[in-house]
Amino acid sequence: MRRVLITGSRVWKDRTTVWDALADELHRSPYGLVVVHGGARGADDIADRWAWGMRQEGFNVTPELHRADWEWHGKKAGVLRNIEMVRAGADVCLAFPLGRSVGTRHCMREAQKAGIPVINFGDKP
């Protein structure tokens, strides 16, 4: 199965862009998709809802949640979660940054360093 890492702004609201990007990835993979995300509001939530919806429709799509533990790790929880998601591996990273999007841009950099292709659907830096 193709692994797709999602990272995006917490204020991302454009469902169509996220859904279309994921649908394109599903068409590339006859064996299905694993949608890796951090469970944040915005782009992550939109991707998660798409994954569950496609799964209910009978497609081989599995959401894979990597939630940040803010209570245990404090301010570095997002960074640690991003590193965990990248280390879990992905065939591609779909990014949906808006404005500064510090955590999103961090995840994009980590994915690039790991050799994961990053496709930016949001604001350019």
From Swiss-Prot:
Domain of life of the source: Viruses
Q: Which SUPFAM superfamilies match?
A: MCP/YpsA-like
InterPro entries in the record, alphabetically? YAcAr
Q: What is this protein called?
A: Gene 61 protein
Q: Which organism is it from?
A: Mycobacterium phage D29 (Mycobacteriophage D29)
Per the UniProt record, the lineage of the source organism begins with: Viruses, Duplodnaviria, Heunggongvirae, Uroviricota, Caudoviricetes
Gene from which this protein is expressed: 61
